[in-house]
Amino acid sequence: MKKLFLIIGAPGSGKTTDAEIIAKNNPDSINHYSTGELLRAEVASGSERGKIIEGFTSKGNLVPLEIVVETIVSAIKNAPKNVVLIDGYPRSTEQMEALDKILKEESDVELTNVIEVEVSEQVACDRVLGRARGADDNAEVFRNRMSVYLAPLKPIQAFYTAKGILHKINGERTIEEIVSEMEGFIKSRL
């Protein structure tokens, strides 16, 4: 049985870095993937699904939700280790519902927890912009990414809270402190 942990958080929350470090600290037991990496790996594999994905990405189009979710679930099932961390998913209620639907049919994958790395908008902005004050376009891009993240956040939180699997972590600390807490939490759930 594969245990899946989804790690969500604002741009600049450190979710990818946290997950990478935890996987590196536990090479025998934990895999980490990002959705983009999984799609690129599927294309590189030359599989039928990879060819379909490339048909969309090569034209700059979004990959249909169903294909994204199938790719994620396939990667989880084929992961060499039993614990899988995926960061940056779900990004929408549609992605959340699609994954939930597929996981209901899967007996060998369990969504163990969704970990939300919480940071204020100001901290996230400072991290993303590297404290380089001024460049409005960068701040503008950040604000857009932030609003895209925040728009579906409440229903996503409510959905996973109702399932009793949402776990929030304060992301406004050192990487060491955050990783230590997150890693300890993940291990406590195995």
Curated annotation (Swiss-Prot):
Signal peptide extent: none
Family the UniProt entry places it in: Belongs to the adenylate kinase family.
Organism whose genome encodes this protein: Wolinella succinogenes (strain ATCC 29543 / DSM 1740 / CCUG 13145 / JCM 31913 / LMG 7466 / NCTC 11488 / FDC 602W) (Vibrio succinogenes)
The record's note on its domains: Consists of three domains, a large central CORE domain and two small peripheral domains, NMPbind and LID, which undergo movements during catalysis. The LID domain closes over the site of phosphoryl transfer upon ATP binding. Assembling and dissambling the active center during each catalytic cycle provides an effective means to prevent ATP hydrolysis.
Annotated segments matching region LID: 130-136
PROSITE patterns cross-referenced by the UniProt entry: ADENYLATE_KINASE (PS00113)
One Gene Ontology CC term in the entry: cytoplasm
EC number per UniProt: 2.7.4.3
Coiled-coil intervals, chain numbering: none
Subcellular location, record wording: Cytoplasm
UniProt binding sites for AMP: T35, R40, N61, L62, V63, G88, Y89, P90, R91, Q95, R133, R145
HAMAP family cross-referenced by the UniProt entry: Adenylate_kinase_Adk
Protein name stated in the entry: Adenylate kinase
Gene: adk
